[in-house]
């Protein structure tokens, strides 16, 4: 890439461009919308470069939250670079990483003076030297991990992102299920690709140590019978019978979350949005802090809400923390009643304060 040509023009506002294929019904919206809603419009002019083949109701909401909407579907990389330079964008923000529909090819041309990638779209480094910064925090990218990123780390204060729950859809927190059922229900709502042999082994050990407990695995990947059969067979290798498992898919997920007492995060690739949702529905989760970036998403979130005691650094500690949490039903019921309040009072819900620091 060639260095960005200096533009000799006095501007009253900095122009920020967000680039994404996900300006639609997508998990990113709960992280991005509160940012767009709280940008200081007296100092910043906000552009959305939307790589969309189809719009929906959420797209209309995004359009109302930005100053300029720029559809990019059908643009070649060079055509998009030309457009960005014509608009004199100052800071270009990638929200997709290497996920489907990304426009990293555009960033490779360095069309703006400053560019950055934010973890909410992917979680990994882009690998592009043309992108200047990676927005994260010091839990997801602790000291000593700089060499794992092609970008310079830009450590955001308190937490790497804010979050906005959909209260109308989520509803209220229910009574701890174990008080009615008489046994602990563990659960996860993650994608199947994150569930590997080590995760299944750890979950199996937890089930064996917590008498009569069950595990809910809810994911669209398990709509398919062959996938359900495959994962059941994996648990069977670790002596866990299928009657301890509830595997399937139900959407929206709130009623499933109401059946769960304790959520279990995956490793080395943590879950994402569902971790926030679990906490807001009163479900504590156990996470194993692993590789920088996607392996520390859970640790970053728990640190932000002041629940570092649910962060493990080894598989055995992960298992033991889950077992210990399940051993005191009354304490678990108290946690369920307090978690939503704890999240509301945490940095992830300080939307205005976060955006001021981001700016």
Predicted region positions:
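A conserved nucleotide-sugar
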Residues: 43-45, 204-237
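Short alpha-helix at the nucleotide-sugar/activated-sugar donor binding site of glycosyltransferases
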Residues: 278-280, 303
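Alpha-helical solenoid repeat scaffolds of the TPR/TPR-like class and their adjacent stem/linker regions
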Residues: 1-183, 201, 232-240, 251-262, ...
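Short glycine/serine-rich donor-binding loops of glycosyltransferases
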Residues: 274-275, 298
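Substrate-binding clefts and catalytic carboxylate motifs of secreted carbohydrate-active enzymes
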Residues: 187-198
């Amino acid at each position: 890439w060639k260095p960005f040509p200096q533009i000799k023009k006095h501007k009253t506002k900095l122009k920020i461009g967000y680039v994404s294929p996900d300006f639609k019904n997508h998990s990113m919206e709960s992280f991005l919308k509160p940012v767009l809603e709280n940008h200081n419009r007296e100092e910043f002019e906000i552009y959305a470069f939307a790589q969309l083949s189809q719009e929906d109701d959420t797209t209309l909401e995004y359009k109302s939250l930005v100053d300029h909407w720029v559809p990019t579907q059908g643009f070649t990389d060079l055509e998009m670079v030309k457009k960005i330079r014509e608009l004199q964008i100052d800071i270009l923000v990638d929200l997709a990483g290497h996920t489907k529909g990304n426009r990293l090819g555009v960033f490779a041309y360095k069309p703006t003076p400053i560019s950055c990638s934010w973890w909410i779209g992917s979680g990994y480094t882009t690998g592009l030297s043309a992108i200047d910064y990676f927005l994260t925090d010091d839990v997801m990218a602790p000291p000593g991990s700089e060499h794992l990123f092609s970008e310079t780390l830009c450590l955001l204060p308190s937490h790497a992102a804010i979050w906005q729950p959909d209260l109308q859809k989520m509803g209220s927190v229910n009574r701890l299920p174990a008080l009615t059922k008489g046994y602990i229900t563990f659960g996860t709502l993650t994608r199947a690709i994150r569930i590997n042999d080590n995760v299944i082994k750890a979950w199996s050990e937890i089930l064996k140590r917590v008498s009569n407990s069950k595990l809910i695995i809810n994911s669209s990947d398990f709509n398919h019978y062959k996938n359900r059969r495959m994962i059941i067979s994996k648990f069977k290798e670790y002596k866990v019978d299928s009657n301890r498992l509830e595997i399937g898919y139900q959407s929206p997920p709130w009623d499933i979350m109401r059946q769960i007492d304790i959520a279990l995060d995956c490793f080395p690739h943590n879950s994402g949005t569902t971790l926030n949702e679990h906490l807001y529905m009163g479900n504590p989760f156990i996470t194993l802090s692993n590789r920088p970036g996607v392996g520390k998403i859970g640790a970053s979130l728990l640190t932000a809400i002041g629940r570092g005691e649910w962060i493990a650094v080894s598989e055995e500690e992960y298992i033991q923390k889950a077992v210990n949490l399940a051993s005191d039903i009354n304490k678990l019921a108290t946690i369920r009643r307090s978690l939503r309040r704890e999240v509301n009072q945490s940095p992830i819900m300080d939307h205005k304060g976060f955006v001021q620091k981001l700016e």
